[in-house]
């Protein structure tokens, strides 16, 4: 019982220094040379009495040492902080962890009379003691006696080597070597080597090697090797290797290799390899390899390989390979390969391969291959192949292949092939092939093939083939083939073939074949064949064959055959056959056969046979037979037979038979038959039919039909029909119909219809219809319709429709529609529509629509729409739309839309939209949109959008968006967005976004974003984002983000983020983040983070973080963190942390942390921590901590800690701690501790401790402690202690040089009788 002593608790640094710089011993007396008995922490030693009170003065560092010391009660002074006392001297009894220190105080407090009151003062405190019963263990002392001391009884054949504060428990034939403060428990035939503060528990036949602060638990026949602070738990036959701070849990016969900070959990027979910070969980018979920060979870028999930051979850017998940042979830027997940032989810037996950033979800036994950024969802037994950015969704047994940006959705057992940007939706057992930008929707069992930009919709068992830009809609069992720009709609089991620009609508069981620009509408089970530009409408069970430009309308069960430009209208059950340009109208159950250019009109149950160019009009139950060019008009119940060119006019129930060229005039119920060239005259209500060259004159309300070259004159309310080359004259409210080459003159409110080459002149409010090559002249508010090559002239408010090659001239408020190759001229506010190759000229406020190759010129506020290859010229405020290859020129505030290869020129405030390969030129504040390969030039404040390969030049405040391979040039304040391979040049304060391989150049305060392989150049204060392989150059205060392999150069205070293999160069105060293999060079005050294999060079006060194999070079006061195999070089006062195999060089006062196999070189007063197999070189007063197989070199007052097979070299007053098979060398006044089979050499006044079979050599006044088989050599006045095992316990044999025949500098050993003898010379 000690009545005058108390126990205190305090903390010291890892090197046992307190806050005042006093070095506390590991055991024994410590005294303050500057003691002053006054309150305060200065000038004395301090501690917590009995460990109770405020913990604020205690150190919270992870490597802080807890010290328990004995203090005289009469020397203690209470200070202000609760529980803390001050004293001049103390005796250290215990050094360890927080738990071990508190346990020591708890177990030994009963040996002391507690001090309950303390009074401060120079005379010492007044102590009132309270006695407590108990036994006391002797404290560890530093006393040295030349006597034999007995140890505690040990189990048979157990070897324990422990430093201060450690606890060892071993069974039969176990070997335990522990650093200070460690706790080890081992079964039979086990070997444990632990650093300070570690805890090891092992079953029989196990091997454990642990760094400081680690915790190890192992079953039988296990092998564990752990870095500092790690936790390992393994069952029988496991092999665990862990980096510092890692956690490993393994079942029987498993193998785990973990990086620092990683977590591993494995069942039986597993193999796990984890990077630092990763998490692995595996069932039995699995193999997992993980990058740093990744998470892996696998069931039985799985094989997972993951990049850093990835997440992998797998069922039994699966194989997963994941890029960094990817997420994988797989059922049993699945195979997944994922790019970085991708997400994969698969059920049993699936095979997934995904690019970076893609998402894959698959059912059982599916195969998915995805480009980067794509999304795939598949049912079982499916096969999906996707381009980048595409989306695929498939049910069971489907096969999908998609281009980039496409969307595919399919039912079970479907096959889809999609171009880029296309959308596909298919039911089960469907086949789809889509061009880029197309949309396909199909039900079960359909087959769709679509060109780019087309739309396909199909029911069950349908087949669709679509050209680009076409739209197809089909029900079950349909077959559709469409040209570009066409629209097809079909019922089930229909067959449609469409030319470009055609429109088809069909009921079930129909067959439609359409030329380009044609329109077909059919009910169920119809058969339609149409030429280009034709229009067909058919009821059920009808058959229609139409030439180009023809119009067909038929009810059910009808048969229509039409030549080009003909018009056919039939009721149910009719049979019509028409030549080109003919017109056929039939009632139900009628039969019409018409020659080209003929017009046939029949009531129900009629039969009409017409020659070419003939005109037939019949009531119901009539029979008409006409030669070519003849005109027949009959009311109901009439029977007319006419020769070619004849004209027949008959009243109701009349019968007319005319020879060719004859003229017929008949009243009501008349029958007229005319030969060729005849003249017919009839009063009111009469019906006349005339032959060739005939002349017809009729009263009011008459109806005249004339043959070729005939002349007709009719009064009020007359109806005239003339053959080819005929001349017609009619007063007000007349209706005129003329044949080829005819001349028609009509008064106000007249209606004229003219044949080919006819000439028509009409008064006010006239309606004119002319055949091919006709000439029409009309006053105000006339309506003109002309055939091919016709010429039309109309007054104000006229409406003109012209055939192919026609010429039209119209006054104010006119509406003109022209056929192919026509020429149109209109005054203000006219509306013009032209066919192919037409020329249109219109005044202000006109609207023009032109066919292919047309030329349009319009005045103020005009709207122009032109076909392919057209040329458009418009004044201010015009709206122009042009077809392929067109040229557009517009004035102020114009809007232009151009087709492929068009050229556009627009004035101020214009909006231009151009097709492929177009050229656009616009003034200020214009809006331009261009197709592929187009060239755009715009003034300031313009907005440009360009297609592939386009070139854009814009003025001030412009916005440019360009397609692939485009070139963009913009002035200040421009916003540029470019496609692949584009080149962008922008003025001041511009924003640029560029596609793949683009080149960007921007002025001050620009924002640049570039795709793959792009090159970026920007002035000060720019923000650059670049894709793969890009090169970025930026001015002052720039922010750069670059993709893979990019090169970045930035001005002052820049922020750079680069992808894999990039090169970065930045000035002062920059922040750099680089991907794998990158090279970063930054100015002072920079922050650099680099990926694997990178090389970093930075100025003063920089912060560098690098991936595996990187090289870091930095200025003073830098903080460097590097991955595996990296090389670090830094200035003074730097902190370096490196991964495995790294090489570190640092200046004075640096702190270095490295993984195994690293090399460290530092200045004075540095702290180095290295992993297994490391090489460490440090300056004066350094602290070195390393794993096994390390080489450590330090200056004076250094502290070295290493595992087995290490080499340690240090200066004077150093402390060295190493495992088995190590080589330790130190200067004077050093302390060396090592395991078995070691070599220890030190200078004068040193202390050496080693295990069995070691060699210890020291200078004068040293203390040497060795176990069995060791050799001790010391200088003068030294102590030699041999620890001997006699089969029951350890005994210490102590000797001093210079006494008892022990000479200095001579090697000594113990013989079999525990006698100290000279080592024989070898």
From Swiss-Prot:
Region described as Octapeptide periodicity: 162-1281
Is the keyword Membrane assigned to this protein?
Answer: yes
The record's Pfam families line, in alphabetical order, gives: Ice_nucleation
Subcellular localization(s) per the UniProt record = Cell outer membrane
Q: Where is this region: Disordered?
A: 271-303, 327-358, 372-399, 423-448
Query: Keywords assigned by UniProt?
Result: Cell outer membrane, Ice nucleation, Membrane, Repeat
Under InterPro entries, the record lists: Ice_nucleatn
User: GO cellular component terms?
Assistant: cell outer membrane
User: What functional role does this protein have?
Assistant: Ice nucleation proteins enable bacteria to nucleate crystallization in supercooled water.
Quote the entry's note on domains: Contains many imperfect repeats of a consensus octapeptide A-G-Y-G-S-T-X-T; further on a 16-residue and a regional 48-residue periodicity is superimposed.
Protein name as annotated: Ice nucleation protein InaA
Q: What is the lineage of its organism?
A: Bacteria, Pseudomonadati, Pseudomonadota, Gammaproteobacteria, Enterobacterales
């Amino acid at each position: 019982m000690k009545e005058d002593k108390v126990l205190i608790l305090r903390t010291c640094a890892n090197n046992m220094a307190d806050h005042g710089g006093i070095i506390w011993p590991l055991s024994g007396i410590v005294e303050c040379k500057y003691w002053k008995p006054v309150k305060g922490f200065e000038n004395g030693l301090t501690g917590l009495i009995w460990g109770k009170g405020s913990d604020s003065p205690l150190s919270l560092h992870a490597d802080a040492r807890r010290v328990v010391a004995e203090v005289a009660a009469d020397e203690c002074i209470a200070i202000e902080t609760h529980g803390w006392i001050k004293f001049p001297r103390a005796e250290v009894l215990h050094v360890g962890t927080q738990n071990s220190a508190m346990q020591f105080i708890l177990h030994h407090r009963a040996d002391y009379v507690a001090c309950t009151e303390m009074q401060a003062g120079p005379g010492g405190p007044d102590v009132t003691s309270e006695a407590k019963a108990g036994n006391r263990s002797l404290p560890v002392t530093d006393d040295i006696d030349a006597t034999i001391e007995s140890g505690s009884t040990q189990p048979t054949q157990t070897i324990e080597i422990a430093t201060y504060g450690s606890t060892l428990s071993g069974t039969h034939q176990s070997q335990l070597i522990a650093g200070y403060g460690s706790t080890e428990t081992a079964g039979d035939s086990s070997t444990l080597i632990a650093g300070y503060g570690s805890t090891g528990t092992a079953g029989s036949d196990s091997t454990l090697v642990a760094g400081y602060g680690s915790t190890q638990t192992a079953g039988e026949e296990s092998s564990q090797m752990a870095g500092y602070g790690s936790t390992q738990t393994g069952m029988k036959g496991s092999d665990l290797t862990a980096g510092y701070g890692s956690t490993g849990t393994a079942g029987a016969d498993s193998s785990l290799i973990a990086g620092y900070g990683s977590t591993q959990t494995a069942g039986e027979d597993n193999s796990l390899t984890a990077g630092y910070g990763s998490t692995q969980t595996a069932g039995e018979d699995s193999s997992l390899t993980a990058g740093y920060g990744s998470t892996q979870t696998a069931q039985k028999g799985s094989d997972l390989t993951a990049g850093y930051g990835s997440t992998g979850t797998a069922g039994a017998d699966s194989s997963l390979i994941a890029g960094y940042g990817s997420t994988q979830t797989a059922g049993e027997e699945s195979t997944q390969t994922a790019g970085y940032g991708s997400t994969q989810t698969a059920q049993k037996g699936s095979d997934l391969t995904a690019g970076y950033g893609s998402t894959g979800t698959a059912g059982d036994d599916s195969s998915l291959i995805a480009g980067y950024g794509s999304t795939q969802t598949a049912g079982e037994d499916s096969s999906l192949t996707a381009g980048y950015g595409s989306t695929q969704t498939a049910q069971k047994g489907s096969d999908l292949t998609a281009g980039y940006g496409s969307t595919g959705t399919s039912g079970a057992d479907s096959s889809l092939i999609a171009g880029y940007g296309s959308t596909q939706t298919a039911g089960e057992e469907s086949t789809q092939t889509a061009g880029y930008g197309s949309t396909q929707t199909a039900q079960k069992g359909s087959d769709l093939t679509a060109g780019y930009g087309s739309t396909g919709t199909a029911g069950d068992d349908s087949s669709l083939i679509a050209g680009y830009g076409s739209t197809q809609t089909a029900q079950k069992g349909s077959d559709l083939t469409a040209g570009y720009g066409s629209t097809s709609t079909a019922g089930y089991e229909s067959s449609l073939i469409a030319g470009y620009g055609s429109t088809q609508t069909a009921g079930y069981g129909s067959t439609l074949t359409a030329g380009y620009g044609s329109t077909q509408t059919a009910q169920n089970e119809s058969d339609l064949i149409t030429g280009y530009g034709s229009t067909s409408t058919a009821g059920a069970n009808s058959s229609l064959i139409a030439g180009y430009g023809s119009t067909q309308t038929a009810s059910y069960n009808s048969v229509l055959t039409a030549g080009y430009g003909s018009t056919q209208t039939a009721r149910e059950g009719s049979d019509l056959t028409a030549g080109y340009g003919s017109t056929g109208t039939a009632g139900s159950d009628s039969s019409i056969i018409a020659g080209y250019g003929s017009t046939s009109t029949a009531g129900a149950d009629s039969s009409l046979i017409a020659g070419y160019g003939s005109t037939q009009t019949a009531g119901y139950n009539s029979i008409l037979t006409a030669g070519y060019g003849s005109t027949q008009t009959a009311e109901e119940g009439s029977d007319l037979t006419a020769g070619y060119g004849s004209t027949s006019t008959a009243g109701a129930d009349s019968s007319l038979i005319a020879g060719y060229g004859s003229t017929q005039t008949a009243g009501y119920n008349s029958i007229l038959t005319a030969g060729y060239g005849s003249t017919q005259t009839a009063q009111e209500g009469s019906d006349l039919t005339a032959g060739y060259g005939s002349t017809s004159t009729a009263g009011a309300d008459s109806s005249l039909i004339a043959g070729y070259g005939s002349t007709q004159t009719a009064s009020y309310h007359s109806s005239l029909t003339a053959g080819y080359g005929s001349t017609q004259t009619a007063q007000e409210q007349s209706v005129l119909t003329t044949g080829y080459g005819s001349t028609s003159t009509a008064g106000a409110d007249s209606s004229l219809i003219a044949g080919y080459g006819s000439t028509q002149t009409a008064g006010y409010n006239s309606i004119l219809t002319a055949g091919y090559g006709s000439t029409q002249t009309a006053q105000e508010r006339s309506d003109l319709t002309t055939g091919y090559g016709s010429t039309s002239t109309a007054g104000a408010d006229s409406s003109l429709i012209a055939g192919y090659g026609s010429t039209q001239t119209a006054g104010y408020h006119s509406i003109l529609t022209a056929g192919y190759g026509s020429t149109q001229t209109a005054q203000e506010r006219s509306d013009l529509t032209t066919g192919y190759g037409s020329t249109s000229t219109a005044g202000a406020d006109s609207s023009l629509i032109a066919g292919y190759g047309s030329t349009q010129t319009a005045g103020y506020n005009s709207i122009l729409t032109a076909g392919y290859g057209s040329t458009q010229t418009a004044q201010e405020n015009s709206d122009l739309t042009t077809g392929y290859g067109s040229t557009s020129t517009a004035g102020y505030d114009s809007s232009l839309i151009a087709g492929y290869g068009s050229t556009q020129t627009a004035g101020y405030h214009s909006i231009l939209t151009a097709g492929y390969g177009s050229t656009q030129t616009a003034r200020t504040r214009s809006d331009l949109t261009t197709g592929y390969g187009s060239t755009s030039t715009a003034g300031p404040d313009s907005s440009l959008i360009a297609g592939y390969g386009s070139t854009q030049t814009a003025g001030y405040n412009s916005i440019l968006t360009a397609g692939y391979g485009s070139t963009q040039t913009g002035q200040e304040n421009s916003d540029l967005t470019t496609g692949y391979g584009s080149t962008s040049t922008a003025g001041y304060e511009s924003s640029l976004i560029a596609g793949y391989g683009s080149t960007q150049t921007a002025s001050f305060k620009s924002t640049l974003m570039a795709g793959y392989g792009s090159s970026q150049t920007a002035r000060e204060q720019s923000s650059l984002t670049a894709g793969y392989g890009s090169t970025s150059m930026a001015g002052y205060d720039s922010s750069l983000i670059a993709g893979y392999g990019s090169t970045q150069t930035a001005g002052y205070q820049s922020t750079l983020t680069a992808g894999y293999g990039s090169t970065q160069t930045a000035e002062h105060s920059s922040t750099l983040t680089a991907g794998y293999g990158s090279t970063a060079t930054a100015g002072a005050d920079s922050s650099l983070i680099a990926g694997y294999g990178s090389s970093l060079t930075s100025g003063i006060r920089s912060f560098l973080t690098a991936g595996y194999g990187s090289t870091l070079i930095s200025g003073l006061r830098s903080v460097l963190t590097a991955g595996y195999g990296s090389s670090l070089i830094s200035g003074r006062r730097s902190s370096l942390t490196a991964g495995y195999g790294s090489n570190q060089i640092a200046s004075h006062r640096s702190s270095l942390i490295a993984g195994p196999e690293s090399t460290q070189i530092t200045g004075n007063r540095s702290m180095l921590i290295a992993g297994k197999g490391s090489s460490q070189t440090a300056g004066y007063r350094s602290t070195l901590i390393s794993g096994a197989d390390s080489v450590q070199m330090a200056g004076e007052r250094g502290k070295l800690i290493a595992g087995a097979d290490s080499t340690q070299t240090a200066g004077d007053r150093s402390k060295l701690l190493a495992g088995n098979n190590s080589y330790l060398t130190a200067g004077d006044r050093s302390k060396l501790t090592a395991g078995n089979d070691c070599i220890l050499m030190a200078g004068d006044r040193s202390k050496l401790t080693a295990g069995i079979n070691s060699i210890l050599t020291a200078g004068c006044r040293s203390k040497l402690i060795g176990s069995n088989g060791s050799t001790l050599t010391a200088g003068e006045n030294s102590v030699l202690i041999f620890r001997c095992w006699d089969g029951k316990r350890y005994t210490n044999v102590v000797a001093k040089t210079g006494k008892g025949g022990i000479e200095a500098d001579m090697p000594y050993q113990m013989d079999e009788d525990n006698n100290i003898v000279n080592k024989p010379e070898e």
